[in-house]
Design a protein with these regions (language model features):
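ATP/NTP phosphate-donor binding region
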Residues: 1-84
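Structural motif
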Residues: 36-37, 83-84, 107-109, 142-144, ...
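Short beta-strand/turn micro-motifs composed of small residues
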Residues: 39-40, 89, 112, 146
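Short glycine/serine/threonine-rich phosphate/pyrophosphate-binding segments
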Residues: 47, 92-98, 117-120, 239
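A short, small-residue-rich loop immediately preceding and capping a beta-strand
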Residues: 81-100, 104-115
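A glycine/threonine-rich phosphate-anchoring loop and its flanking beta-alpha core
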Residues: 103-198
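Active-site segments that bind and position negatively charged phosphate/pyrophosphate groups
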Residues: 189-289
């Protein structure tokens, strides 16, 4: 029999106050590294200093804006090629570490400080280069450690963006299937199923739930599974359709007016459902959910 082999995260930990147990989590999974380098922002370092002081890092590197050039600049300071990179931050920091790890062929894990998009486990990094947001293919992380209590402290706007990014999988899957019917593009039913299931995982929740541990856990797991769908498809297709193209166009054409990726994607999702998916669409259902 024939099987498809894919890389899946060795570590997936979602829980309260688990970041301080990073070393124990690595040992429990038989992962041993001589050194670890933390990549984060100065703001997060200062905010979570008491927790970070309980962990041992060979060095701490700081990311400000998360541009392509900044990622290369920070990357060039890494001389030890046998370290584990720990990306602690939002999408910009995680995407910068993805590029660094991919270029240097280093192993990395993600520790999201918020859940604004699927950066925590997608094989794609979106970075500002030459004045425009660009996508770069990268390897997925070795693992994800989502500390619910840290994520709870992030602005609600970021969490809502994460919901928008995840729910938009429904639109992406429709576009992928349309390309299959209309253009003969190959599809992966397993990847489509993962993308759909992960997108549906947050539908039962309301705005009042966004600080709850259960919601944070389901959002984190959903974003990871969405990333896994992309890894399985070897493409962003399961989680990126017309709604993402609209968001990318906003970034390209109106860089000074663009906002969070997940919020733009949610708006694009509504636009596509309302104006292009006829005669049947999910526009009314989406409006009720987003309201």
């Amino acid at each position: 029999m024939y099987y498809k082999t894919i890389n899946v995260p060795i570590v997936l930990e979602v829980g309260e106050d688990i970041f301080v147990h990073l070393d124990d989590i690595l040992k429990e999974n038989h992962l041993y590294f001589k050194e670890k380098i933390l990549v984060t922002s100065m703001e997060l370092r200062d905010l979570y200093k008491s927790r970070l002081d309980k962990l041992s890092f060979e060095d701490i590197l700081f990311i400000k804006g998360g541009s392509y050039d900044e990622a290369l600049e920070v990357m060039n300071t890494i001389t030890n090629k046998e370290v584990l990179l720990v990306a602690f931050g939002g999408g910009s920091i995680i995407d910068a570490v993805k590029l660094m790890a991919n270029t240097l062929d280093l192993t990395y894990i993600t520790v999201p400080s918020t859940l604004s998009n699927d950066a925590i486990y997608s094989p794609i990094a979106r970075l500002l280069k030459d004045g425009k947001k660009q996508s770069f293919g990268v390897k997925a992380p070795l693992g994800i450690i989502a500390d619910v209590n840290i994520i709870k402290g992030s602005p609600e706007k970021l969490l809502l963006a994460g919901v928008g990014d995840l729910v938009s999988n429904a639109s992406a899957v429709k576009d992928w299937y349309l390309a299959h019917i209309d253009k003969g593009e190959s599809i992966n039913n397993f990847a489509m199923a993962l993308a759909s299931l992960s997108g549906n995982s947050v539908i039962p929740y309301t705005f009042n739930d966004i600080r709850s541990s259960r919601f944070i856990g389901d959002l984190a797991n959903g974003l990871v599974i969405s990333g896994l769908a992309m890894v399985l498809a070897n493409s962003s297709r399961p989680a990126s359709g017309a709604e993402h193209m609209i968001s990318h166009a906003i970034d390209d054409l109106f860089p000074n007016r663009s906002t969070l990726h997940g919020l733009q994607v949610a708006w694009g999702h509504l636009l596509v459902e309302r104006d292009f998916r006829k005669p049947e669409n999910d526009y009314e259902k989406l409006m009720i959910f987003f309201e």
